[in-house]
Regions:
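Domain-level detector of nuclease and nuclease-like folds
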Residues: 1-196
């Protein structure tokens, strides 16, 4: 599939920040951030040590279609929930259902069509931004952080910043927040084919 999900990461909550936790610490430790809540650290090197999520079979099946690391031996969904969802008390089906829905909305957008149409090709950041702007407005291009690796640069990650109060509604021009940095992709990058 041309667009998969790695996770849904809530930003630093004000309640956690008020206890002296900064953004860097929150991004590193998530729900295991000390001094609160007192949850074990979710470690990427031991994803399967994370507790079971309690996902329904229906949601697990949908999630496996958009998150290749879900289920099986990687335990990505367990790790992601333990790190980013457990401390909020999110219902696992709702949390992962949101990921599935957002993935589908992005795929059906002009940005998603742009990615699909240019699979395996070199594209410009300007053209990617224009496709995103067609769906949600030029001002919301700043909500997208693109990460590239290699030479030539291959697009490896897309992060989209969404307002907390908009996460459960269909994406609209009012859904997004600007990112502090647009990412490290230069003027052009390759939209990599899966498996290469």
């Amino acid at each position: 599939d041309f667009l998969t999900v790695h996770g849904l990461w809530p930003g630093l909550p004000k309640s956690v920040a008020a206890r002296g936790v900064d953004e860097r610490r929150w991004m590193r430790f998530g729900c295991a951030t000390r001094p609160i809540p007192n949850l074990p650290e979710a470690r990427a090197s031991r994803m399967c040590s994370s507790p079971e999520t309690g996902l329904s079979l229906e949601t697990a099946a949908k999630l496996s279609e958009v998150m290749p690391g879900a289920g099986g031996r990687s335990c990505l969904e367990r790790y992601e929930y333990a790190k980013h969802g457990a401390c909020f008390g999110f219902d696992p089906d709702a949390y992962f259902g949101t990921m599935v829905r957002l993935n589908q909305e992005i795929k059906e957008s002009e940005a998603g069509k742009f990615l699909a149409d240019n699979y395996g090709k070199t594209v410009s950041r300007r053209d990617f931004d224009a496709a995103f702007a067609k769906s949600w407005g030029k001002e919301n291009v700043k909500a997208v952080k693109l990460t590239c690796q290699g030479n030539p640069a291959y697009l490896t990650e897309i992060q989209i910043s969404i307002k907390a109060d908009a996460i459960n509604a269909p994406l609209s021009a009012n859904s997004f927040l600007p990112q502090p940095h647009p990412g490290n992709c230069g003027k052009t990058f390759v939209i990599d084919k899966a498996g290469y």
